[in-house]
């Protein structure tokens, strides 16, 4: 399934002809369950099918440095409480990059103003730098992937003949994960931990769309 999504996302831009194309830059905030609220930056390209529908693709980037409290609790429960050290072990630097195919419908509600509803399906890649359990001053790297979907709506305002400004509110869903084994050098106890990153949450963004 993931391979089919990747192939579809790669060939989608080739089907979008030059006529009626647009590009959008989006900035805002994203509040996934796994991390605290942070800044998110995105680009969406696409083509207008008619006066209502458009299709396209989007790519976003979200970065957060945080302490995984769920992992801290697991370390405390299994290896014994050592809050300060386990918090260091649970420090995580996460980069989320969802790539999605999108469909948007919009309708006029006033002069130069339209409301829109949008949806997307695709794949989310997480690039994760996390601390080594035995040597928490050292970073290790892992990539995780999962299916992603998004639903949203907003308001579009026509600035000029080839430019719009817009605001949108969307809900994003994805839960990439992976498993790894940790062995405590003092107790000799081993455990397989699952790092699940619940990237589901609300995002609020503003942006500009340019037609060419």
Language model segments and positions:
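Surface-exposed strand-loop-strand hairpins of Gram-negative outer-membrane beta-barrel proteins
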Residues: 29-44, 70, 144
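Outer-membrane beta-barrel translocator domains and adjoining extracellular loop/strand segments
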Residues: 36-40, 67-74, 127-136, 178-186
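Flexible, solvent-exposed coil segments and beta strand-coil junctions
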Residues: 19-26, 77-85, 128-136, 184-188
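Gram-negative (and chloroplast) outer-membrane scaffold detector with strong preference
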Residues: 47-133, 157-162, 199-212
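Predominantly the C-terminal beta-signal and adjacent terminal strand-loop region
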Residues: 67-68, 151-212
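Residues that define the transmembrane beta-barrel architecture of outer-membrane proteins
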Residues: 19-21, 37-41, 93-99, 143-149, ...
């Amino acid at each position: 399934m993931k391979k089919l999504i990747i192939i579809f996302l790669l060939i989608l831009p080739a089907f979008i002809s030059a006529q009626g194309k647009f590009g959008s830059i989006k900035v805002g905030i994203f509040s996934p369950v796994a991390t605290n609220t942070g800044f998110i930056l995105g680009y969406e390209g696409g083509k207008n099918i008619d006066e209502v529908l458009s299709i396209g693709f989007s790519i976003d980037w979200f970065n957060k440095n945080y302490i995984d409290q769920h992992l801290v609790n697991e370390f405390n429960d299994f290896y014994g409480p050592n809050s300060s050290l386990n918090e260091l072990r649970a420090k995580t630097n996460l980069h989320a990059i969802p790539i999605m195919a999108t469909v948007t419908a919009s309708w006029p509600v006033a002069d130069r103003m339209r409301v829109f509803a949008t949806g997307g399906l695709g794949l989310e890649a997480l690039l994760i730098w996390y601390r080594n359990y035995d040597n928490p001053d050292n970073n290790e790297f892992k990539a995780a992937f999962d299916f992603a979907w998004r639903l949203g709506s907003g308001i579009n305002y026509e600035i000029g003949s080839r430019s719009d400004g817009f605001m949108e509110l969307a809900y994003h869903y994805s839960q990439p994960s992976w498993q790894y084994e940790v062995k405590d050098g003092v107790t000799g106890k081993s455990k397989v931990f699952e790092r699940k990153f619940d990237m589901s949450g609300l995002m609020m963004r503003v942006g500009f769309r340019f037609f060419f």
